[in-house]
């Protein structure tokens, strides 16, 4: 890098059923094998000799950042990796379709973990496989600490802290009681009211709506100017909740898309753990399915 732009090469290690995993910014020797357990990702008949969680632990040991790319597919081991605290972020993408925005399938599965209290940052990634999509179509923006130098380590620290949003164009600021994205706010058992402040601007995808997502549901929604908007809401919180900002937009003569999404702020109310029975059952079933696949 030259001080304004930094480029760092990482790897996407793969197992065609257990999942893919992006290992970024680590030092030392390359984390191998990069593929295992064929047939689509490795040699035909190749046994599974390493798991996603093992790749993730080695990356963390070598100082790197661990991302689940094109989340949630392939999905089998991602549940165990997230629950085990091995994942720093999940990648929102549209699988090559510039005009479809952040895929709702990615969002709904990410929401499942947030609903159970697992705070994992949102990141954006193009997953460019063809000439149909330009590099950087969907991006990650991470807010670094003001006292940190502009370097890759500072960027990784910001992603780990969840000070991120994924976007197809709109830039957003979002704070809950003055706390940035990725924060955790502790409340007494009586709950309380939080002040939500936001701002959004776009010179690419025209914006149409800004929404406040609370525990996976739309709590507030407002139509906005295509280029610039701001606002605030006061929200009563009686049980533990996560709050995030979602920006919708659309290109001319195209359907509305999810154009940007923040990492949430988690509000922990004393005596009210994050609970979502249906989501928890699905996560457990996925972990059990991964174990069954390995056993057979």
PLM regions with names:
Residues 76, 116-121, 126-296:
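C-terminal functional module detector
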